Structures are given as C-alpha cells and as structure tokens.
Amino acid sequence: MNQVDLDSTHRKGLWAILAIAVVASASAFTMPLPAAANADPAPLPPSTATAAPSPAQEIITPLPGAPVSSEAQPGDPNAPSLDPNAPYPLAVDPNAGRITNAVGGFSFVLPAGWVESEASHLDYGSVLLSKAIEQPPVLGQPTVVATDTRIVLGRLDQKLYASAEADNIKAAVRLGSDMGEFYLPYPGTRINQETIPLHANGIAGSASYYEVKFSDPNKPIGQICTSVVGSPAASTPDVGPSQRWFVVWLGTSNNPVDKGAAKELAESIRSEMAPIPASVSAPAPVG
C-alpha cells in the first residue's frame, strides 16, 4: 500500500493553483489588447520644454506660361545656404586707375591693359599710353608694348589748329584730319567715318573716327579716333588756359581701335585746374 505524502500533494496543488492563476491573469491581461489597439492612445502629459518651431517654407506658384528658371527659388530645400560670415562684395570704384597729369591740368582713368609711357618727346599732348602685350621678363624692366597702336592725350591748346574751332564736333573732325596726316603720312583713302557724341561729368564733347585704306596693299588699314571734351576758352584774358582736352587713339586692322574704350577714356577726363578767383572790384566812392 502506497502512502500518500500530504505535503507533496499540497505543494503540487499549490503550484497548479498558481499556474492556473498566472494563466488566468495572463488571459485577462492579453485578451483586451485587440480591442485596445483600435482605441485612441492616452494623451501624454504636457512637456515643460518649448520645441523649436520648424522653419516655414514659402510656396511659390508660377504663373501660367511663365518660364521655369533652373536657379534655386526661395524656399527650395536644395538651395545652398547663405554663409553669414561671407564678406560683402566690394563696390567697383569708377575712379580706380585715375591718373592726374599736372602739365595738362586734367585727370583720366587708365584703360585696362594699357600703361603710361614716357611722353617728353611728344610734339603734341602731355600723356602717352602704350598697350601692354606681356610682362617684362625681369622685374624692374619696362613692360613689353605693342608698336602699332598708341594713345595720346593733352590740352587742346593753340599748338593745334583744331583749337580754333569753338564747336567740339568741328574741333574733333579737324583734329582727326590733322592727326591723320601727322601719324599716318601715307597715300590712301579715308573710309568708315563716324561721329560719336560724348558727355560725362558735366563735360560735353565729340569724337571722330575713320579708317585709312593705304595705296600700298602691304600696309594694314590704319585707324584713328580723335576726341575733344570741355569748353573753349572765353574771350576775356583772365580766365586762364583752355578748358578743353583731346584724345588721339591710333590703331590698325591688326590691332584695332576699341571705340567703346576710346569713348570711356574721353568721358573719364576731368579738369584738375584750380578755379580762377573772382576779381575784387574797388569800393564805390562815397559822396
């Protein structure tokens, strides 16, 4: 006859009851899950931290028929970001490269690619400019310049017949004719003549351009552009020297005159002469 261990039976029954209770509690916990899955989640407690607002994006609707630009538009997430530390672009100084000629009493802006040369040997004018073609091989030596083009500037004084013309248009044409004979003393035919109005810095003027087709076919076509700016001297003797200046730009078909640059050069001329003081009249007699 087998003897029953009451303690063992009691323990087994206790574990069975606990197992059934665990299973029952698990069933009681897990069964409502499918129903709770479709329910709204419980609201989270409010946070004390303030979230950073998301950057607003501007939505731009193009007009019908408007061309589509390939550049990045405002609000484009692919647009490059601006560097707050980037330097602001510097404004271009219109007087950069300005040169003052004390002998002629004027200043001008040096054209790009040109250098000032020795002018003491000039028969007319007080400034000689040469076109640079390469830098000097040795530091300190003069720049290598072209030999078939040059620019001469100076005061339109009585050395030049053109100074007798009070009208700047006529003075520029006369100057071009005289300088053409002086610098291009070869037989030929003048072609492609032009008159170019000038006005800048309150100084009116005119330019005359033409080309010379030489009789010698081996010579390249010559080109000359002469400009006159300023006002002719008054008839009174105390007004000082002439307030007119000239520019002569010489070139060839191999190294042509830049008419746009010639216009800018002439229009950059400014008077650097001291104003003539007004004469002081004697006081009227009292009586």
Swiss-Prot record:
Q: Where in the cell is it found?
A: Secreted
Q: In what ranges is there compositional bias, type Low complexity?
A: 40-56
Q: Which Pfam families match?
A: FAP (PF07174)
Q: Give positions of region: Disordered.
A: 40-88
Question: In its keyword annotation, does this UniProt entry include Secreted?
Answer: yes
Gene Ontology molecular-function annotations: extracellular matrix binding
**Residues of the signal peptide:** 1-39
Keywords in alphabetical order, please.
Repeat, Secreted, Signal
Gene Ontology cellular component terms for the protein in this record:
extracellular region
The family annotation for this protein states: Belongs to the Apa family.
Name of the protein described by the UniProt record: Alanine and proline-rich secreted protein Apa
Task: Provide the species name.
Answer: Mycobacterium leprae (strain TN)
| The organism's taxonomic lineage, starting at the top | Bacteria, Bacillati, Actinomycetota, Actinomycetes, Mycobacteriales
